[in-house]
């Protein structure tokens, strides 16, 4: 779980989102969670299978949305010597240098990376990454490569994951600002409220970005956030 260091929010929110960062997802260490039904106040245990985890998704964002309050989470951790480290993502290896990695050093590297790239929500209003990284098929990737040969992609379970930030930045939205709403200057996945922007304005900006990405790449960006 060291790769998940500094993700904002409470532990109870982790299963809802199946939080993930730097090559690791919660579902890899998840055992079960306890939750209380908002209407009946009855408690229920949700197993790994029950949660129906997917990429930044779970049963709590679909069939059971707004029905439960998660009160505790049980994780399965590994002992020293059996722990599988994940460092081949982002700038983790670059920060670690030639040192032998361990969970603590990886967590420290992740925290340093996040602090350097992500705005503090206490200072600038934001919800972190606004969009999921889209997953596309081989045929669409081939079409995109004809026009955008520099597009980065990763092979995942028979399909290809594209960094949403790259798509947004390619269309010059990084640092874009309209009134008090905008796209962060250092991280194109983050939409920000500079002071007095409304939720509607943020939503309109996200829809504008989605439309432009689809127009140029035929890729539908899906919001990672839950809009109330």
Each model region followed by its residue ranges:
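A gly/ser-rich beta-alpha-beta helix-loop segment of oxidoreductase catalytic cores
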Residues: 1-34
